[in-house]
Regions:
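Non-catalytic terminal and connector segments of soluble metabolic enzymes
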Residues: 1-202
Length: 202
């Protein structure tokens, strides 16, 4: 009896800093070596609408993130000039400004437990504390503290979906149905017993 492993998907965005540093190939290589399949990929210049839809956060998120920024400012003896929730909103403003300032590479990675696997490969959101061996841990040393002081988005190379539900919400923002390919890889045929046209073998 064939074990039918779910084809989970994750959205990956190689951000402008990853593109500008010519890390596209190295980043894709990490995912493919692990056994994930690239079922969609394109380079584009994001629109403000795309980014605002993608980074759709609520007031609870703004307040939580903004409170952390206020604490960082206070530790450094720097002035706190607005309410915590506004600092939280500034995070999205700076991200949108940054993400629309240069090309990104949008990728759909597919495979068993794809969101968890991609997150593991990418590493923690804050580069300076990301584990060595992860993409962020190996290729950048930026931090929330430095980005807060500089009033800019943290340069952490990549966005990736944290879970299946997030991936299902994010993927349609960046890809149309016709841009997602169905095919099989040698990895799938060896481990999961699928046919060459991407269908499960009987």
């Amino acid at each position: 009896m064939t074990t039918k492993v779910k084809k989970d998907r994750s959205l990956i965005l190689i951000k402008p800093d990853g593109v500008q540093r010519s890390l596209i190939g190295e980043i894709i290589k990490r995912f493919e070596q692990k056994g994930l399949k690239i079922s969609g990929m394109k380079m584009l210049l994001p629109t403000v609408d795309q980014c605002e839809s993608h980074y759709n956060k609520n007031d609870e998120w703004f307040l939580r993130k903004g409170t952390g920024i206020v604490e960082d400012l206070q530790k450094e003896g720097l002035p706190v000039e607005k309410e915590a929730i506004e600092y939280g909103r500034d995070i999205i403003r700076t991200i949108v400004k940054y993400m629309t300032g240069g090309p990104v590479v949008a990728i759909i990675a597919e495979g068993h437990a794809a969101p968890a696997v991609v997150t593991q490969i990418v590493g923690g959101t804050e580069p300076v504390s990301a584990d060595v061996g992860t993409i962020r841990g190996d290729y950048t040393i930026d931090s929330y503290y430095m980005s807060t002081i500089d009033n800019r988005a943290v340069r952490n190379l990549i966005h990736c979906s944290e879970n299946k539900e997030e991936a299902e919400r994010e993927i349609p923002i960046w890809f149309g149905e016709s841009e997602v390919m169905n095919y099989s890889t040698a990895h799938e045929r060896i481990l999961y017993d699928v046919s060459a046209d991407g269908h499960w073998a009987s």
